[in-house]
């Protein structure tokens, strides 16, 4: 009896080794980290001969999908996509080093502070003028135009003599549109559409056996589910859109890259 029990436990232990190595350890608390660009090529794109000045308004780059976070147990009002996607766009533009990005998200606060500075200088008779705000020659607009759940799902498994193993997966997709608009003419200079897959994978093993003359039941389960972060997938899609915008703008001679 002991031997049979030992064999059952040994099989489930060995089968669990099929799970990805990074899943073998239980998750632990980690320190906060400073996020880097997901698309490394964006940081290596090079410098523009003359950096274009661009602006991103919060209302000009938002989630247009209205997609709710999936839940099979109860209704949820949480959205599947962040309601501040413009933050990722601003970050991608800024960290690429290719553009001058002007502040438009907190424009009201910026204007108020400038008014306070002017008022203070007038009261203390300081006539030094305040530098004018930098205006943008280009507007970066667009949105998250699509989020589709369960685009593809499937899996496989096997069971023999009460010992089983299975793997399941599911794919969602997020679609991002990015436009580059000339402020002077209102003309759309560039338009990019990017689709990113979001993958979820579940792996499990189990043992279901009767021991001790079929009077005692042994049941062991082991498994792990990994869901790709929607925010990281969205960040990757937006960074890819910015990278493609830089490449297409260069091909159309809207800007040039140093040391070419």
Pin down the residues of each PLM region.
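Bacterial N-terminal signal peptides
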Residues: 6-16
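C-terminal/domain-edge helix-coil "capping" segments
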Residues: 18-52, 148, 155-157, 168-260
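N-terminal segment of the mature soluble domain
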Residues: 52-150, 173-191
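Extracellular loop and loop/strand-boundary signature of outer-membrane beta-barrel proteins
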Residues: 127-128, 162-166
């Amino acid at each position: 009896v002991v031997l049979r029990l030992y064999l059952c436990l040994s099989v489930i232990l060995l089968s669990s080794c099929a799970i990805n190595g990074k899943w073998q350890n239980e998750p632990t608390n980690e320190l906060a980290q400073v996020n880097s660009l997901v698309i490394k090529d964006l940081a290596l794109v090079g410098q523009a001969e003359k950096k274009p000045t661009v602006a991103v308004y919060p209302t000009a780059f938002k989630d247009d999908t209205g997609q709710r976070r999936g839940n099979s147990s109860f209704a949820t009002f949480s959205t599947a996509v962040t309601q501040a996607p413009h933050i990722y766009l601003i970050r991608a533009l800024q960290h690429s080093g290719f553009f001058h990005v002007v502040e438009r998200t907190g424009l009201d606060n910026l204007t108020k502070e400038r008014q306070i500075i002017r008022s203070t200088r007038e009261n203390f008779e300081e006539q030094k003028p305040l530098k004018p705000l930098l205006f943008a020659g280009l507007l970066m607009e667009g949105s998250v135009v699509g989020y589709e759940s369960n685009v593809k799902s499937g899996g496989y498994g096997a069971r023999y003599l009460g010992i089983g193993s299975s793997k399941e997966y599911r794919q969602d997709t997020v679609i991002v549109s990015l436009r580059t608009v000339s402020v002077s003419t209102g003309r759309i200079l560039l338009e990019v559409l990017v689709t990113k897959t979001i993958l979820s994978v579940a792996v499990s093993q189990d043992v279901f056996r009767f021991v001790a003359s079929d009077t005692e039941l042994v049941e062991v389960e082991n498994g792990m589910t990994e869901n790709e972060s929607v925010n990281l997938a969205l960040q990757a899609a937006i960074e890819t859109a910015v990278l493609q915008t830089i490449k297409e703008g260069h091909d159309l001679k809207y800007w040039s890259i140093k040391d070419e």
